[in-house]
Amino acid sequence: MDITKLINLFAKLPSLGPASSRRIVLHLLRHRQDVMVPLAAGIRELEMHTKECTICHNLDTISPCSICSDKGRDQSIICVVEELGDLWAFERGRIYSGVYHVLGGALSALSGIGPEDLNLGGIVDRIRTHGVKEVIVATSNDMDGQVTCHYIAQMVKGTDAKVTRLACGIPLGGEIDYLDEGTLRAALSSRYVIT
């Protein structure tokens, strides 16, 4: 393969431009045995063994994935996320012990993404067959995320599960003076009782 072609392939990855891609390729060329060979083998193995979970659409080496298969997880709570990276953010924080449902995006009229383009189908089935009590909608706090949240709430309406949405507002360590009006409004309406 041509070196320039490899640089261009790396540049297609998120957050990597031509300069960063060039540095990565040069590093790989200088460290063929200790970096390039294991990296290539790892990518090949990942491509061969990664599966999409038939339940939640997570990616893992097994299906159902290790999260859906974990008997220690609370199967009565489903956290609906837009993307796989969102699931991994929750897992990294070790702040959630339920199961997930990865949509693969958000509804977007501007981008032409409708319900048929997302992994929405299994949510209601999971609620009915697994005794789900709560669906946490953890979509982005933008217009597309809010539309997606509303759509999911309508889907779930005829079931016994309650639908909750992540609170939004002041970030941890954030100063009120630096917040925009929308964030401050969201924080004010999401307030909770302390005493």
UniProtKB/Swiss-Prot annotation:
ZnF locations on chain (C4-type):
53-68
Which keywords does this chain's UniProt record carry?
DNA damage, DNA recombination, DNA repair, Metal-binding, Zinc, Zinc-finger
Task: Please list the residue ranges annotated as the Toprim domain.
Answer: 76-171
One Pfam match, given by its short name, reads: RecR_ZnF
Q: Does the keyword Zinc apply?
A: yes
What would you give as a GO molecular function for this chain, any one?
DNA binding
SMART domains according to UniProt: TOPRIM
Q: Name one GO biological process term.
A: DNA repair
Q: Which SUPFAM superfamilies match?
A: Recombination protein RecR
So which domain of life are we looking at? Answer: Bacteria
What family does the Swiss-Prot or TrEMBL record give for this protein? Belongs to the RecR family.
Q: Which HAMAP family match?
A: RecR
What this protein is reported to do is described as: May play a role in DNA repair. It seems to be involved in an RecBC-independent recombinational process of DNA repair. It may act with RecF and RecO.
According to UniProt, the name of this protein is: Recombination protein RecR
The gene name on file is recR
